[in-house]
Amino acid sequence: MLRKIPFLFYILLVTASANAQYYFKDIISNKQLIADMTAYKENKVRTITLKSFEDNGSESEGFFCEKKLSRDYRKAELFTRADIAPASLFTSIFDKDGMLLITKDSSDLSVTDIVYTYDDKRRIASVISHIKSNDDDFVNIISQEHIYTYNENNQPEKMILVKNKKDSTIILFGYDDNRNVSIEKDTKNGTKFFYYYDSKKNLTDIVQANEYSKRLKPDYVFEYNSAGKITQMTAVEEGSNNYFIWKYTYDNGLRIKEKCLTNEKRLMGSIEYEYK
């Protein structure tokens, strides 16, 4: 009998996006990691255990996931293991002011290192990544540099993307009337991402368009509670019209449960968080 793939790993595989979304991945995600560590520190959290459950309520077989935080809250280590995937360790390093400096995602198959630098206004100046993957026959190394410049309103104006230290592309940003980043354009291939916000400037939608199609394709849709926490995220399956809906529950500012549903509202599984 074939072993069932834990739902969490299945979802991560089918929603893993190859799309750019540099503003989202470099700047917004950076702020979220910093905010998460701040919340852990305020609640004196030292260990977080994640439990994964299948659609029938049974615990995902062979799944283990735990995050440990250092005493000074400058280091977080997330260890994940499952029967169907190699064990992985995701490490985040912060400076004394809580700014994210380094992330490292490592397993037997690949290692991804990302280094963040900031200017004197605490804005991201660069994001430098190195990905090393191992196969039976060869080792593949990919590097990227994202170098940001800003306008007089402290908004990202341009990003120079350098791949493997030789191939460069300029990414341009545009803004809406509320000075939110609303457009991200790759000047080489014409790909555009549109960012939409609610009245509180929370990001609500990321929509993709390109020069060869007039049809706008949503990648993510977010909903929030009164405290500004994400209560629902809709993520489109890569290369498909299917999508998954994540619903989040919080207590004292910390996420305690999330469940995943298909576009047909069928429960795929859930995750529960334990804090110590």
PLM region spans:
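Bacterial Sec-dependent N-terminal signal peptides
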Residues: 1-25
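Buried hydrophobic residues that stabilize the cores of well-folded domains
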Residues: 21-276
